[in-house]
UniProtKB/Swiss-Prot annotation:
Keyword Magnesium attributed: no
Coiled-coil ranges from the UniProt annotation: none
Protein species of origin: Alteromonas naphthalenivorans
Protein name as catalogued: 23S rRNA (uracil(1939)-C(5))-methyltransferase RlmD
Family of the protein in this entry: Belongs to the class I-like SAM-binding methyltransferase superfamily. RNA M5U methyltransferase family. RlmD subfamily.
EC number(s) given by UniProt: 2.1.1.190
């Protein structure tokens, strides 16, 4: 790495800011650091020196190590790149690539024309298999460093087909000029909307709706009242939900209805109070899980965006959990029953706990419709220690956790006290997972298996799954 620092040799210990030194405008500048300060973003950018990337973190950022640790968006291992520093905190600099001097053999041209502006994807510049391999290795190294598990416990990653993997999306809208509407995703590190006609990572049934939907809402004053548009492709139909802040004019509603009829999709509008009006419905949306079961999400319910990888993920979780008839199993953060239904199909008695009351009722109704009666569905605040301890008081043989990005810290502390034999933890945030896993390990559990689930190709996000078993005392 070319950027370097020189400590001050003087005895003055005052906090003097770092500065850039150069003999003249034609000479290369170098950052000079005094003893108690680090160069500012402006200092780093003024130096305009290249860095060599020697690794990748689990989010897909290039890493350059030296006196300073650089995390560089858009850079790949082995590359020498010029950068723009975005933030600097002591020995850590966050930056983005401005020029690639020596490209990696794994660098590719993004397959989307707006990939460099759109905030939807961050990793189209690297071959997808290489991105998965590098990030898989980065996560394994991070977990080994923080959790100290046996390397042989690391499992092959779960992945699926690319690039059209997303069955769900939320489109932002800029209708300040109703005659020139922008419909798309927010730009990378900004608030502006990148206008699109289609999206190459959406399933085709969603991507092909974007252009006609924009036409349907262009020219209407009510378009200014739309906050966002949600799309969901089910097994049997497509759901379009338009979120609005105030009452929509009749002509705008009529245009949405006509669009739904012409495109043969479900159309729902949602007002500022969360009330839904169904303008057109082909059929209630269904999303398959495993063993022939399906979910029936409402317009705002959570479902995994990647249908193929979700099926593989559920199958692996079931294999690791190994539910059996007669066992008592807790499926917490259960949502609509993505894991619950196939677990219950084993004959085990299941406690399904979810924080959103509407999803609990929908999940229960859907389960009964499919003949599943051995589940106790419960709405519970899983961040409340007393409620969690009370719900665990009956005792469970096994537990499956699938929390949101905030993790399951309260639940993990409670599980250490409740001592179930087996825990399968599915996480969408490796940082909160490693925090929670440390609680379990310190509380007497051993991480037997762990691995990556590539739910979101081409993005910074990564899911993980781990199996914990209670150590014999």
């Amino acid at each position: 790495m070319a950027i370097f620092y020189k400590p001050s040799k003087g005895k003055n210990k005052s906090n003097v800011k770092g500065r850039v030194r150069g003999a003249g405008s034609g000479e290369k500048q170098h950052i000079v650091k005094t003893k108690q300060s680090w160069p500012s973003v402006d200092d780093i950018n003024a130096a305009n020196e290249a860095v060599t990337i020697d690794g990748m973190d689990w989010q897909g950022q290039g890493v350059a190590r030296g006196d300073t640790l650089y995390f560089v968006d858009g850079a790949l291992p082995g590359e020498t790149v010029e950068i723009k520093a975005l933030s600097s905190n002591k020995q850590i600099v966050n930056a983005k690539v401005t020029k690639v001097n020596t490209p990696s053999e794994h660098r590719q041209k993004p397959f989307c024309g707006v990939a460099n502006q759109c905030g939807g994807c961050q990793l189209q510049h690297v071959e997808p298999q290489e991105a998965l391999a590098l990030r898989d290795d980065a996560l394994k190294s991070m977990f080994q460093r923080k959790l100290g598990f046996n390397e042989g416990a690391w499992q092959a990653p779960v992945s699926g087909n690319r690039p059209r993997y997303r069955r769900k999306a939320r489109l932002a809208i800029d209708a300040r000029n109703p005659d020139k509407i922008k419909l798309g995703f927010r730009e990378n590190a900004g608030k502006n909307i990148v206008d699109i006609e289609g999206c190459p990572v959406l399933v085709e049934s969603l991507s092909q709706l974007i252009a006609p939907l924009k036409s349907a809402i262009t020219g209407y004053a009510s378009a200014r009242l739309v906050g966002h548009v949600s799309l969901l492709a089910g097994e049997n139909a497509v759901q379009v939900t338009v979120k609005h802040t105030r009452s929509l004019a009749n002509d705008f509603i009529a245009s949405l209805s006509q669009f739904a009829v012409e495109q043969n999709v479900n159309m729902t509008i949602e007002d500022g109070n969360g009330e839904f009006t169904h303008l057109h419905e082909i059929a209630p949306i269904t999303c398959n899980t495993v063993d022939g079961f399906y979910l029936q999400p409402g317009p705002n319910d959570f479902v995994q965006v990647n249908a193929e990888v979700n099926t593989k993920m559920v199958a692996q979780a079931l294999s690791w959990l190994a539910p059996k008839a007669g066992e008592r199993i807790a499926d917490w953060f259960s949502g609509l029953g993505n894991f619950t239904l196939p677990i219950a199909n084993s004959g085990a008695t299941v406690s399904a706990v979810e924080g959103v009351a509407e999803m609990v009722q929908r999940a229960k109704s859907n389960a009964l419709e499919q003949g599943i009666t051995n589940v106790d569905w419960m709405q519970l605040d899983l961040a409340d220690e007393k409620s969690v301890d009370k719900a665990l008081a009956g005792g469970f043989d096994k537990v499956l956790l699938d929390p949101s990005r905030e993790g399951a810290l309260t639940v993990c502390h409670a599980l250490v006290r409740a001592t179930p034999n087996t825990i399968v933890y599915v996480s969408c945030n490796p940082n909160t997972f490693s925090r929670d896993a440390r609680v379990l390990i310190d509380g007497g559990y051993q991480m037997q298996k762990a691995g990556v689930v590539e739910m979101f190709p081409f993005t910074h996000h990564m899911e993980t799954m781990a199996l914990f078993t209670r150590q014999q005392q």
